[in-house]
Amino acid sequence: MNYDVIVVGGGHAGIEASLAAAKMGAKTLLITILAEQIGAASCNPAIGGLAKGHLVKEIDALGGQMGLTTDACGIQFRLLNESKGPAVRGSRAQIDMDRYRVYMRNLLLNTPNLEVTQEIATEILTKDNNIIGVKTHLDNNYGTKKLIITTGTFLNGLIHVGFNKLEAGRVGELSSKSLSASLKSLNLEMGRLKTGTCPRVLAKSIDFSVLERQDGDQDPTPFSFRTKEFNKTQLPCYIAYTNEKTHEIIRSNFDRAPLFTGQIEGIGPRYCPSIEDKINRFGDRERHHLFIEPQTREATEYYINGFSTSLPYDAQVEMLRSVKGFQNAKIVRHGYAIEYDYVSPTELKHTLETKKINGLYLAGQINGTTGYEEAAAQGLMAGINAALNLKTREPLILRRDESYIGVLIDDLVTKGTKEPYRMFTSRAEYRLLLREDNANLRLSKYGYNVGLLPKEAFEEMLKLKSNLEKGMEILLTKDMSPNKENLEFLASIDEDIINEKVPLQKIAARKSFTIEKLRKLNEFFLNLDDKSLNQILTEAKYYHYIAQQQIEVEKMKGLLDIKIPKSLEFKSISGLSNEVVEKLNKFAPPTLAAASNISGITPVAIDILHIAIKYHCQKTK
């Protein structure tokens, strides 16, 4: 049984990888431990958030699936940081996690070129450092040249609840020990990480009347640029707070906390600590927020976001019932911590193919990341690049200046990680260029070129791009003089008058200027759609900042164009420290730009390396 591409793992990374490969024409097999759990939301029932929403928009622009399914299964939509600048706003949706899972599974089962089998992958088969297949627990050998591993927390997974330990990849599902051993046998550098999840509580046991209600946006915007209609009927979330009694209960159980007893060895996520870790680290806090999120549209269970814990079950019940509104709470599913193996992402090329084994790709939590969106983004890129390689086409490597996906992968590959990595807007140097609202303008060309984005979606983007270019040309080339007619116009739209001739862009850049006012500024804008007008207005308001970032990008592109010859011996370059030589050898950056992103590689070292490359190229001509 031979396939062009085999994907191991049916989580968010595996879904995007298998769909991408199959849609690009590769005969694809998805191997998953439990077919019913394809697309399961193991942790919180939500997609997106700050920076994570950017990733979902970029996945969508490339032709991926996550945004479309979120729109189909969303039960609340919110734009976070709406009062701040467009670069740091983030879309977030609560999802019906049951419907999301069924939707994704049905989609995969009905996708041409894609087969699904419920088996456990146990061994990676190689020959002369090339992938030739994968073996399963049923002694089936599946042949392939491209193998994508997207195992999430299942690699040697170990669940902790108090002193109790359970080998599992998720509660109720087996872990994958043999596959972890197989990866280690390939001499890949591996480590151990930890994450956790929160209790789920029976809705009828919660007193919602004493909780703060949090509604979605009145006029929600879908995640996908391709979604034309979606269910705007939304469910509320709620906010609760821990208190000093809660904290006392947690402190009294520190001696039973796997996190503090040494039972857990893996490093947990810095920005999503367990509740016991919060109480330990922030002992002066009087309370901590808890976000009470419905798991489905029926809202029979609620996820207690912010209450991740691995304390014993009895302690979980006691501390939860100390929270106002939860005095009679009944836990349906307890919280737990889980440790799992991961591969150091410095073992990867920017294509997400391993450097040591040709045809072996890794995506998702196996690369040290945390989050559905980070996983899906990697899965999509691994699937695309595996399929492109089969066609002997150039790989798709997104730059840091054109996508958050590019930032994510570049950070992982060039810097590595010793703790679960999550995306933040602060990780992107050019975030004004990488807004949610222009993701399709930035990336649709790639999605269309590889064959994932439909033609109509690409043409819609081209129309938006044309409107933006024409609109900005008008704003930058046409002026407004302080004559009587113009002053009366400004007064009619409640705008301050001008005392000198100014470009229309300066008028549009005012904080008070809206798309309704823009429509009246020039006849070109009169009949434009809101999406185009919003895009034009954003570009106008941040024009000078955007222009400055584009200048910085052009400087960096100069470094991108300078490739580091594989034959260049770093240790022979005078002036490079032993640390720099060691890191250059370890990471093998393909370009000067990639080298400059490696932690510890100084600007001086880049200058020395640049000179050495010039000399090397002249000598080898």
UniProtKB/Swiss-Prot annotation:
Cofactor(s) recorded in Swiss-Prot or TrEMBL: FAD
SMART domains: GIDA_assoc_3
Binding site for FAD: G9, G10, G11, H12, A13, G14
Annotated NAD(+) binding sites: 268-282
Coiled-coil zones: none
InterPro entries named in the record: FAD/NAD-bd_sf, GIDA_C_N, MnmG, MnmG-rel, MnmG-rel_CS, MnmG_C, MnmG_C_subdom, MnmG_C_subdom_sf
GO biological process, one term: tRNA wobble uridine modification
GO MF annotation: an example: flavin adenine dinucleotide binding
UniProt keyword Flavoprotein, yes or no: yes
The UniProt record lists the keyword Transmembrane helix: no
Database matches in Gene3D superfamilies: FAD/NAD(P)-binding domain, GidA associated domain, C-terminal subdomain, tRNA uridine 5-carboxymethylaminomethyl modification enzyme MnmG/GidA
SUPFAM superfamilies associated with the record: FAD/NAD(P)-binding domain
Compartments, record wording: Cytoplasm
Keyword line: Cytoplasm, FAD, Flavoprotein, NAD, tRNA processing
Function: NAD-binding protein involved in the addition of a carboxymethylaminomethyl (cmnm) group at the wobble position (U34) of certain tRNAs, forming tRNA-cmnm(5)s(2)U34.
Family indicated by similarity: Belongs to the MnmG family.
Protein name as it appears in the record: tRNA uridine 5-carboxymethylaminomethyl modification enzyme MnmG
